[in-house]
Amino acid sequence: MILYQVFSVLSLLITIYSFALIIYIFMSWVPSTRETAVGRFLASICEPYLEPFRKIIPPIAMLDISPIVAILVLRFATTGLWGLYRMIAF
């Protein structure tokens, strides 16, 4: 029971972080939103995660697709997390 709760909380945190990334991406489309307090906070938690993806994946025709790949990696991490739970619990 406690194991399920731990995995549920981890999954929820990954989901919340995914939404933070999406909000941060949309904020990049609106000028000067990254200079706000919310923008700086999101930059401080999102940029360290996005930086390795940006080093590996170059922009394609002025379009940065690395955040999309980063979000997909988080989705795969959630799926892997629940797979690990199934292996441990059953």
From Swiss-Prot:
InterPro entries: CCB3/YggT. The chain crosses the membrane at residues 6-26, 56-76. It comes from the Bacteria. GO terms for cellular component: plasma membrane. Its main location: membrane. Keywords: Cell membrane, Membrane, Transmembrane, Transmembrane helix. It is found in: Cell membrane. It is a multi-pass membrane protein. Belongs to the YggT family. This is Uncharacterized membrane protein YlmG.
